[in-house]
Amino acid sequence: MGSNKIKNLVQYEIQDFVSLNKMDTKSHDSLNLNVSKKSRYLLHRVLTNQLINNRSGNACTKTRSEVEGGGKKPWKQKGTGNARAGSSNSPLWKGGGVTFGPKPRTFSNKTNKKERLLALTTALYLKSNNTKVINLDNLDFTNLKTRDLVIKCSNLIENYKKDQKILFVAEPTASGLWRYVKNISNVDLIYTTGLDLKKILQAHHIIFTCKALNDVKEVFNEQ
């Protein structure tokens, strides 16, 4: 991903969260983080490292020694009028080896734990100013339909547009929620044990469960 796209992710405008209790807005909590340190610079740095670490690095080309065939000299050294050639595997020949081509490698780049934690803290802080949080704890997942979830979320989020991304943040025990969001293209789900900086920055609206909200506050309010 280019540098401009990364900067666009970091510079997302702060979006409002939505409040919900039993799929309504009668009561809500807020994500008010008490943090002393924030770093927009680390947002870019940690996000860049995250994208780099996701690269597979499996591009591979063959050198002249790895190309099949080419063991016989194409023509004799002198007397033909052609340039001298020793093998059809030469990089000068079509179908020959590649000079200095890419080989499988790792692009992994270490990110310090404190830096990653501060970047997540900054992202959550920017997203939490004057926001509300959805409480899904009393939601009956056994009878919930994906279609109903889409309709309710679109009705609850003010000025919601179809191209806006919604991110659910839940505790690991709320695995049943994944069944209802996995088929929606602009809706994603992450758990508090694996907060994803890129997804947080990309999201226009973030929906917390009550348990996930408490877990996030417990960790990030100490920063």
Swiss-Prot record:
Pfam assignment, any one: Ribosomal_L4
The record's keywords, sorted A to Z, are: Chloroplast, Plastid, Ribonucleoprotein, Ribosomal protein, RNA-binding, rRNA-binding
The answer to whether keyword Transit peptide applies is no
Signal peptide position in this chain? none
Q: What is its main location?
A: plastid
Question: What Gene Ontology cellular component terms go with this record?
Answer: chloroplast; ribonucleoprotein complex; ribosome
Question: Its quaternary structure?
Answer: Part of the 50S ribosomal subunit.
Return the similarity comment.
Belongs to the universal ribosomal protein uL4 family.
Q: What is this protein called?
A: Large ribosomal subunit protein uL4c
Q: Which organism is it from?
A: Guillardia theta
- Gene name linked to the record: rpl4
